[in-house]
Amino acid sequence: MTGIKKGKNKKKNMKNDDRYKELDSLITNGSEIGNNSGRSCVKRFFKIIGNEMKNNVYVYLLSILYLCVCVMNKVFAKRTLNKMGNYSFVTSETHNIICIIVFQLLYFIYRKTSSSSVYKNESQKNFGWQFFLISLLDASTVIISMIGLTRTTGNIQSFIMQLIIPVNMYFWFMFLGYRYHLFNYLGAFIILITIAVVETFLSFETQGENSIIFNLIMISAFNTLSFSNMTREVVFKKHKINILRLNAMVVLFQFFTSLLVLPVYNIPFLKEIYMPFSEMSTNINNGLRCLFYGENTIVENCGVGMVKMCDNCEGAWKTFITFSFFNICDNLLACYIIDKFSTMTYTIVSCIQGPAITIAYYFKFLAGDAVRKPRILDFLTLFGYLFGTIIYRIGNIILEKKQVIKSQNSNDSEAELTSIETSRA
């Protein structure tokens, strides 16, 4: 049995080695590339990309699906805020209730349809504090993001989202011991430079509904989001836990932990959303009437540059339900990608959603009143992000190759030890 197992591992490693031969010829053998024509290098480069996509077709199809869901989630989150941005607490808690019902129902169906042994083994493990920590971090992220989105325009929103990449890289390097290749840093640097150039151009434009303070609030949400992703990484890698169970329990905790973040609405310097506790019950009542009955309450002394946004509650429930649907799909796909692949894959996919969101704002049937006119700057930004992502992915491929070689050397050493022990016997 040992010989058969070693033979299978050797065959698998040989297959993986074939996958990286083209990469070696392009990256490692620099002198050979220098002697080839530019056309040959470009042809070889695209051949590597083709082989990469062929060998990971499932990953890329899943990534495209997740990308589409992410874009729709962010677009309808913004449309929901445009309709009832004065009632962020109401939309957040109502969304939590919907998620509780959906995830608990899905997990109940899973328990009934799965084998008893699988469910018994999983239910014996207690992840109480992990669930609480993830839910607390997610609740903080949702609340802070909702606050930031109230005065963050579509283009700025999509560009700020890309800052999650260096933030994730830093936290995973410091706390999870991730080690990156030079190409990972280069890819992230290209993306950051693209962001800097875009922000420089946009800073000369007049954007009345954009607020630097709220941009910074939205950026601060990345800290809690990164810690939440790290906790999920530890739970998925060290413990085998069902995705439905994770989301069902986390959203249940999140319904209560989000109440702990409630005092943020009472911070005086947040003038646009400042709401004393004495007005909380009135705000909740008006928010529910806006969501379910389409009644506008705040219609005077409101709008761009004013303390309050004007209510636009007609059809708010349709927009809100659509947002909840895509947000639930977003959570499930994100957990699945982290579970089956890695947080690196999740980071790469998250990178592309920025320019994708920007392009989505070109279409009125998606963006609604927040529709934007196409600009050359947006397409240059998309090119910069894609180029940085490709460089980032090449770094991952090189790291994967090193792991394969390390695993092959380890298997060869074990085979030699087994052979020596057999000869001695």
Curated annotation (Swiss-Prot):
Its main location: membrane. Belongs to the CRT-like transporter family. It comes from Plasmodium berghei. Residues 78-88, 148-157, 203-210, 271-318, 369-378 are vacuolar. It comes from the Eukaryota. Glycans are attached at N86. The chain crosses the membrane at residues 57-77, 89-109, 127-147, 158-178, 182-202, 211-231, 250-270, 319-339, 348-368, 379-399. This is Putative chloroquine resistance transporter. The lineage of its organism: Eukaryota, Sar, Alveolata, Apicomplexa, Aconoidasida. One of its GO terms (biological process) is amino acid transport. Nutrient transporter. Involved in maintaining the osmotic homeostasis of the digestive vacuole. It is found in: Vacuole membrane. The keyword Transmembrane applies. Residues 1-56, 110-126, 179-181, 232-249, 340-347, 400-425 are cytoplasmic.
